[in-house]
Amino acid sequence: IEKNVAAARTYSRFAVEQGYIPIAPHLLFPQFLNDTDPKERELGLFFGNAIMSKCSEVWVFGSHISSGMEAEIKRAKWKGYHLRYFTEECQEV
C-alpha cells in the first residue's frame, strides 16, 4: 500500500508540473473511510466516481491495472472521458 501511495503522490506531482489539477481519491478517502469495511469501500468508490464526473481527462499510470483501476477505466470509457496512458516514469504512451 505504501508503494502505491508513493506512486500516486509522484503521479499527482507530475500532473501539477504539467499544469493540471490532480484528483487522487485513493489518497484522500482512506484518511477517513475504512477501506477494509465493504460498505465504506463502496462509499469511497461512489465518491470517486462522482469526482471523476467533473474531470476533463482520466490519466492511467503504469502497466499493472488493478481491479479498481480497471473499473475506473471501464466507467471512463463508458462515459466518453478522454483517457491518457503513462508509464511508471511518467512518459505518455
Regions found by a protein language model. Give the residues of each.
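Catalytic phosphate/metal-binding cores of nucleic-acid and nucleotide-processing enzymes, i.e., regions
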Residues: 1-93
